[in-house]
Amino acid sequence: LGAVHGIASVIGGMYPAPHGEVCASLLTAVMRANISALMSRTPESRVIQRYERIAHLVTGNSKASFSDGIEWFIKLCQDLEIPRLKRLGVKKDEFPQIVISSKLSSSIKSNPIELTDSELLEILETAY
């Protein structure tokens, strides 16, 4: 389930925000953070190739990069009017607690790479 669900479950426990909307609002920020962390810490990871394969599938372009895939998902979220965390009522001053609690969630343990506190905070900032 990974970081999307790990963070979303914490937010859902703190705010009356629909789980699916929280997950969707976090998706592209988590994708970016995962790819960045993988490229810098484990560039040989096959997960990077999986992100590229997803980009090929969603864009219909066999030469699409993982960045193209992320842009496709960003556009989809805009088209579907997925709310940002701010619109879902999440308070920025609670980001540190969300990070701490997210690291304890069982879902985050299945993320393809362990994310640092600063990476988790950046996800929240990006999705805000």
Residue ranges and their predicted role:
Residues 1, 63, 82, 108-111:
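Intrinsically disordered or highly flexible coil/loop and linker segments, enriched in small
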Residues 9, 28-32, 56, 100, ...:
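Generic alpha-helical structural context detector
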Residues 6-9, 25-26, 68, 97, ...:
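Amphipathic alpha-helical interaction segments
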Residues 1, 7, 44, 75, ...:
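Homeobox/homeodomain signature
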Residues 91-128:
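Short, amphipathic C-terminal "tail helix"
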Residues 14-94:
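Gly/Pro-rich interdomain helix-loop hinge
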Residues 1-23, 105-109:
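Glycine-rich phosphate/pyrophosphate-binding beta-alpha loops
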